Every structure is written in C-alpha cells, then in structure tokens.
C-alpha cells in the first residue's frame, strides 16, 4: 500500500487544486471601519454555476485516527467547495488532479493549520473532511441547485497516512 507523506499547506503548493483561505500578507488586504478592521479581500474563487446558488453550512467532522486508509475520493463538478475551520485545530486535506480518475499515486496530502481554510476548485478530487484530534466544526461554502454535484469513486489501490509530518 502506498504511504502518503503530508506536506504543509501553502498557497503555492495547493494552487493546482484551489485556494488557501488565510489572513496573510501575501494576499490583498486593507483597513476598513475607521481603521478598526483589517480586511483580507477576495480569498477564494467561489463557483456555483448558472443554475446554482452559494450556501453556507457547518459540517461537524469526527476525528480521524492515524494510520488512516484513503480508499475513496469525491468531487463536485458543478461548483467549488470551501472549508474554514472553526474549532482551532489542524486538519488534513487529500487531493488529486481533476483531469483524470484518481489513483493512489496521484494523491497529495496537506496538513492545514487551524487558521487555514481551503477552497476546492470545481471538479477537484478530494477526500471528505479529515478532522484531527477532536470533533471539529467547519464553515462550508458550496453550491446548492439542480443536478448531481457529487461524484464518489473507490480507489483501485488504497493509500495510508501514517504521520502528520
């Protein structure tokens, strides 16, 4: 079984899969509200398609235990999907290139800090929520609308995540 090594989540490394949502000097930001608030502006490219609308939900993820076997992936072809952690804990992100059916050799694992969210671009293969340590809440912005917007596939060969670093 292929072992996945987790890398730290960065904007550059995650760019082929979507956006990293974080308050960073690397993004456009400016002061508003008479100087009392710093706005980190336009952090994610949200897609909902012509017939969809953006919705905001909270997902409550149960903690995953390592070693963890990655045996399936999913994607949302009609819209993006953003996850922003609310519980102050790191979590894992597993993704694969949207251009082909994912295999274990195509997977990448990222360790996201508690202050980093992710926005999966439409069609990007990803593993469902991978909370760590304790039950964790995530603010989710995704698409509601007609049509099937969730494809799930089993992997022909599984991969294992044994450690965070």
Identify what each model region corresponds to.
Residues 92-93, 119, 127, 140:
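Short hydrophobic/aromatic-rich beta-strand segments that constitute the beta-sheet cores
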């Amino acid at each position: 079984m292929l072992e996945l090594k987790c890398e730290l989540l960065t904007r550059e490394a995650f760019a082929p899969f979507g956006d990293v949502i974080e308050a960073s000097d690397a993004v456009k930001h400016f002061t508003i509200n008479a100087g009392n608030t710093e706005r980190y502006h336009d952090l994610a490219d949200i897609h909902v398609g012509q017939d969809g609308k953006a919705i905001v939900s909270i997902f409550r993820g149960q903690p995953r235990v390592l070693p963890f076997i990655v045996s399936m992936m999913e994607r949302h072809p009609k819209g993006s999907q953003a996850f922003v952690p609310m519980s102050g804990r790191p979590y894992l992100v597993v993704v694969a290139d949207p251009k082909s059916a994912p295999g274990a050799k195509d997977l990448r694992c990222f360790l996201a800090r508690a202050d980093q969210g992710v926005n999966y671009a439409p069609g990007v293969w990803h593993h469902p929520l991978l909370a760590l340590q304790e039950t964790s809440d995530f603010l989710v912005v995704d698409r509601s609308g007609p049509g099937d917007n969730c494809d799930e596939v089993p992997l022909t060969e599984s991969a294992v995540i044994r450690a965070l670093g």
